[in-house]
Amino acid sequence: MSLNFLDFEQPIAELEAKIDSLTAVSRQDEKLDINIDEEVHRLREKSVELTRKIFADLGAWQIAQLARHPQRPYTLDYVRLAFDEFDELAGDRAYADDKAIVGGIARLDGRPVMIIGHQKGRETKEKIRRNFGMPAPEGYRKALRLMQMAERFKMPIITFIDTPGAYPGVGAEERGQSEAIARNLREMSRLGVPVVCTVIGEGGSGGALAIGVGDKVNMLQYSTYSVISPEGCASILWKSADKAPLAAEAMGIIAPRLKELKLIDSIIPEPLGGAHRNPEAMAASLKAQLLADLADLDVLSTEDLKNRRYQRLMSYGYA
């Protein structure tokens, strides 16, 4: 797969282009008198060192760009890589099946679990079908239906958060967008089974929170979680979306800051260069964290789960 490089990765992109050129020449003419392999190896090492240097000092705005990377793994990618026997369940049994939310039963290391997550698209047609990962009310009602099903069958719930926000269209508002989000917040706080939530990309406002109330909340290293996008915040405070980098820093949208504020529990490290560089390794790390979280929660009674979740929610907003 050919990688898409972000603006701040251009020095890496230039090195990788040189490597690709030399590799192509080597393949075309194996009778060359010069040894290209040594030069390719040297450039690869230099690329790794440069990547490590750049990624050691990323700002909030650069991390926000990584969270939106078009090649970043989505919910269904992690389902394929970390789970077995996934059976997707569709529809809210009231209006429609919202493709921006996917969910179903799967096995995690042999254990039945309910998976629910936002799903963006990659190609244009899929992006439109998935509404760019922005759920309508029927998506959140589908999610709630699956959560209640999981509770009936005593299955842990695992959610993956990756949305710019809930869909703000007129139709969504007419069908009760705010009510659907609010109901999910309330009902998730009452669930009698373990709930583990992980932000895998963008965690945008109420659209993220509607499947984000859990006993454990994790973030991938280069994901974001915020009440509004940096561009939206900049447009309100500075009357210009160009101030988005400044807004990103001020808002505290990245995982280390949110862990410092005790809004999340764990930060899951990503492969060098981001999750899209090695989805298999990222899925393995994610799976290990999910198994560890469920092991911690399995020893708790239903009442303990509910009480801990309540205390967690009530602690928000206090330093």
Swiss-Prot record:
Pathway: Lipid metabolism; malonyl-CoA biosynthesis; malonyl-CoA from acetyl-CoA: step 1/1. SUPFAM superfamilies: ClpP/crotonase. InterPro entries: Acetyl_CoA_COase_a_su, ClpP/crotonase-like_dom_sf, COA_CT_C. Competitively inhibited by pyrrolidine dione antibiotic moiramide B (CPD1). Residues 35-296 form the CoA carboxyltransferase C-terminal domain. Its EC number is 2.1.3.15. Pfam families: ACCA. Component of the acetyl coenzyme A carboxylase (ACC) complex. First, biotin carboxylase catalyzes the carboxylation of biotin on its carrier protein (BCCP) and then the CO(2) group is transferred by the carboxyltransferase to acetyl-CoA to form malonyl-CoA. This is Acetyl-coenzyme A carboxylase carboxyl transferase subunit alpha. The gene is accA.
